[in-house]
UniProtKB/Swiss-Prot annotation:
SUPFAM superfamilies: PLP-dependent transferases (SSF53383). The keyword Lyase applies. It catalyses: L-histidine + H(+) = histamine + CO2. One of its GO terms (biological process) is carboxylic acid metabolic process. Its EC number is 4.1.1.22. The modification N6-(pyridoxal phosphate)lysine is found at residue 233. This is Histidine decarboxylase. Substrate binds at residue 120. PANTHER family: PTHR46101, SERINE DECARBOXYLASE. One of its GO terms (molecular function) is pyridoxal phosphate binding. Belongs to the group II decarboxylase family. Keywords: Decarboxylase, Lyase, Pyridoxal phosphate.
């Protein structure tokens, strides 16, 4: 590959920009504490995981053997026997959510998708793409789904086979919908467990809850039918990706034979990135579960540190249990742009992903927010 001098200069400028901002992130859930340099040599090859990793494919350059290992690992931490599960490495959380909703639609073809207003914005898009009826549910103050409103709307719609989109960590507040509560409430109105579907969006918290002492309900053992997690969030990856796991019996409904590649296919995308499979495989093989627990505990400790610092000066910051997302009043535009914060209405958040090895970046942000909010308060009262 030969670039012109101008293009070489442009790409060098971007390289330096990336170096400068490598660890910038405090407002979005992207861990940057990864090193996949041992895998760089594989970028010489076009590795394509088209089709089903458990079957033979006529496309020789695939990483199916590694994908099988990845899926066995996630079946274990999401508490489903490997032989009863199926899933794959996706292009990201949205594809995983679409896969779960697709399975649900094929199981209950004329049903409504119920999700809270704190759900990720992509779910409305998924409902349109899959041509599913959908219903937005109110949220509680902490970001959880409003269970009373959920049941009220299911009853109002006379829904016999609701499809529940459960958040295992909402985008803005890290709130976790109570899967067991949802099942209890549905049972109270006479809807049997076999008559509805629960998909769990665990984009960030899916790699937190398996490694804490007192996790909220999140797994197949707790009653879900499918779950997805992002690879570039808590795990960390230079390329966005994700993992989706579902019950094999439901996946078989959408499986088709593809003679072009001599294999079966049951994925959303056709060609799939074989390199991200290697990244996820290396990530799970290079750490023990004890090391993951220690990493998560550090992130949670940093989150509580941020809450304590805010609250010490009277700023009402908070976080949900087992969440590394710290919510606080939205500062001025100058501050949230300076620190690349995600904002929604009158709130902002910081996220203590694992590359925050000490409190320096957290302190820098908090100092600016305190100065900004306290200054605004003084101006409001006329000082």
């Amino acid at each position: 590959m030969i670039l012109s001098p101008a293009d070489q200069e442009r790409i060098e400028t971007f390289w330096n920009y990336c170096l400068k901002h490598q660890y910038f992130n405090i407002g979005y859930p992207e861990s940057a504490d990864f090193d996949y340099s041992a895998l760089f040599r594989f970028f010489k090859f076009s590795i394509n995981n088209c089709g089903d990793w458990k079957d033979y494919s006529n496309y020789a350059l695939n990483s199916f053997d590694f994908e099988k290992d990845v899926m066995a690992y996630f079946a274990e931490i999401f508490q489903i026997p490997f032989e009863e599960s199926w899933g794959y490495v996706t292009n990201g959380g949205t594809e995983g959510n679409m896969f779960g909703c697709y399975l649900a639609r094929e199981l209950f073809s004329d049903s409504t998708l119920y999700y809270s207003k704190d759900t990720h914005y992509s779910v409305g898009k998924i409902a349109k793409l899959l041509q599913m009826k959908s219903c937005v549910i109110e949220s509680l103050d902490n970001g959880e789904i409003d269970y009373d409103d959920l049941i009220h709307k299911i009853k109002t719609n006379k829904e016999s086979h609701p499809i529940i989109f459960a958040n295992i960590g909402t985008t803005m507040t890290g709130a976790i919908d109570d899967i067991e509560m949802i099942q209890e409430r549905l049972a109270q109105i006479g809807i049997m467990r076999r008559d509805y579907y629960i998909h769990a969006d665990a984009a960030l918290s899916g790699m937190i809850l398996p490694f804490v002492d007192h996790p909220q309900a999140f797994s197949f053992a707790h009653g879900i039918d499918s779950i997805c997690v992002s690879g570039h969030k808590m795990i960390g990856s230079p390329i966005p990706c994700g993992i989706v796991v579902a019950k094999r019996q439901n996946v078989e409904r959408i499986s088709v034979d593809v003679d072009y590649i001599s294999t079966r296919d049951q994925t959303i995308s056709g060609s799939r990135n074989g390199h991200t499979v290697l990244l996820m495989w290396a990530a799970i093989r290079s750490q023990t579960n004890l090391q993951r627990r220690q990493r998560i505990q550090h992130c949670l400790k940093m989150a509580q540190y941020a809450v304590d610092r805010f609250q010490a000066v009277g700023i009402p910051a908070w976080r949900n249990p087992n969440s590394i997302t710290v919510v606080f009043p939205c500062p001025s535009e100058h501050i949230w742009k300076k620190h690349y914060l995600a904002t929604s209405g009158n709130m902002a958040h910081l996220i203590t992903t694992a590359h925050h090895r000490d409190t320096r970046q957290i302190d820098s942000l908090i100092d600016d927010v305190i100065f900004d909010l306290q200054g605004a308060s003084k101006r409001t009262v006329g000082f």
